[in-house]
Amino acid sequence: MDTKINNQTKYNSKELNTELINLSALEVLEWGFDKFGNNLAFTTSFGIQSSVLLHLIQSSSLKNKVKIFWIDTGYLPKETYLYANMLINKLSLNIDILQSKISPAYMEAMYGKLWESNNEEDINKYHQIRKVEPLEEALKKYSISCWVSGVRSQQTENRSKMKFIESIRDRLSLRPILGWTQKEIFYYMKENKLPQHPLFAKGYSSIGDWHSSSAETESTKGRATRFGGIKQECGLHVNDYQI
């Protein structure tokens, strides 16, 4: 087995990406566990395509051996909570739910409804409080060296430039399905009888919080349906947000 990588290990991201480029998504997961062991964790949003990565985990030797974090902002649609419960039961998942130390009511009292201002700075603050800080605190608490997400290069301009593994806020981020197309996601879900998010049937292709997600239109697709197109990233997958 390869030498484990932890927070103190020096690494060469170019060399690591070379190791990953010809591996399947399942092999990337196994590689990640070999490299990082208990210092590896996963994130899920229980969004449109979340079942794919969760099913891959449960189909591998990582089943019930790694932490899976779900960031509950307190503003998720009812359908997302119901979908999460469905997948947790169907896939026998052990989920760690992460929440901000600041309740939604307290945040609104202090800062107002940040998502209503149509101001990018306010949206960044919202993401920092409700998503980035809870994740960073959990990663630190459990000494996570590398966290795995289900981002894909087709989703946003920022993600089109991503590599399979690279540093995000002083930790490594691993992306097993980075190169998957929407078609591959659809057929994987179909072949493995994975249920669709309830809002998929209502025209949603990307789902975050209830107040900032909308169904697709003829002119607005994918993550452009989030926050009225002002922002396509929630802050978790970029380096701009710092604790």
Name each model-derived stretch.
Residues 2-243:
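Nucleotide-activated chemistry modules centered on ATP-dependent adenylation/adenylyltransferase
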